[in-house]
From Swiss-Prot:
Disulfide bridges in this chain: C43-C113
Region Complementarity-determining-3, residue ranges: 114-120
Gene3D superfamilies assigned to the protein according to its UniProt record, in alphabetical order: Immunoglobulins
UniProt source species: Homo sapiens
Protein name per its UniProtKB record: Immunoglobulin kappa variable 2D-28
InterPro entries named among the record's database cross-references: Ig-like_dom, Ig-like_dom_sf, Ig-like_fold, Ig_V-set, IgV_Light_Chain
Subunit structure: Immunoglobulins are composed of two identical heavy chains and two identical light chains; disulfide-linked.
Keyword Cell cycle among record annotations: no
Source taxonomy: Eukaryota, Metazoa, Chordata, Craniata, Vertebrata
Entry superkingdom: Eukaryota
Signal sequence coordinates: 1-19
One Gene Ontology MF term: antigen binding
Ig-like domain ranges (all copies): 20-120
Region (Framework-2): 60-74
Positions of the UniProt region annotated as Complementarity-determining-2: 75-81
Length: 120
């Protein structure tokens, strides 16, 4: 059974900073999925998000229909409290991936990656 809603969204985000704008690009634009199957979303930053402290300042959010965005992954690979272990984040520098090991119907929504290295 295919899930009837769009799983993914594309986000391009510009944030001003002293070293120039950081542009975040996600792919794919949308991804039809089947419950029980894996899914993967890619995110690329125009600048490295790896801080001198060794952390990647990249967060993943899920916005379910009719709800506010909820934090899934912070600092590139850390699951937020209450997030199922089927969600995992990986990557470093400019290239990151969110993986869902086994998609469930409740996972439908729009997924966003967000850099947290620069703030307005």
């Amino acid at each position: 059974m295919r899930l009837p809603a769009q799983l993914l969204g594309l986000l391009m985000l510009w944030v001003s900073g002293s070293s120039g704008d950081i542009v975040m690009t996600q792919s794919p634009l949308s991804l039809p999925v089947t419950p029980g199957e894996p899914a993967s979303i890619s995110c690329r930053s125009s600048q490295s998000l790896l801080h001198s402290n060794g952390y990647n300042y990249l967060d993943w959010y899920l916005q379910k229909p009719g709800q506010s965005p909820q934090l899934l992954i912070y600092l590139g690979s850390n699951r937020a409290s209450g997030v199922p272990d089927r969600f995992s984040g990986s990557g470093s520098g400019t290239d990151f991936t969110l993986k869902i090991s086994r998609v469930e119907a409740e996972d439908v929504g729009v997924y966003y990656c967000m850099q947290a290295l620069q703030t307005p």
